[in-house]
């Protein structure tokens, strides 16, 4: 996975100062190794057209449903602040995500950004256990 954590800070300069090097890096990775690109704060529409990368990890600012039926793989987009919810709400969220994307072969569940220190690991566990029980 290529993490371009600050790519969203660039506007018109993104292609010249970031994407050009990402493409060069991706082209030098053997073809049997999948490449996933995460660019925080950048909508991936323009990136899709400018790269051969076929898997994108979305941050929480992008709309996953806008991309789900394209010929790319989508990962991420779950807002980790939702882990502040109570256990019942977390189980509901896991069920909603599972039901919405269970028939999509191009979706990988993942977070849209990192966990902050104030998130209770037990809450993450509740969510993941529910999601896992639904998918098995």
Language-model region placement:
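Active-site loop segments of alpha/beta catalytic cores
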Residues: 1-136
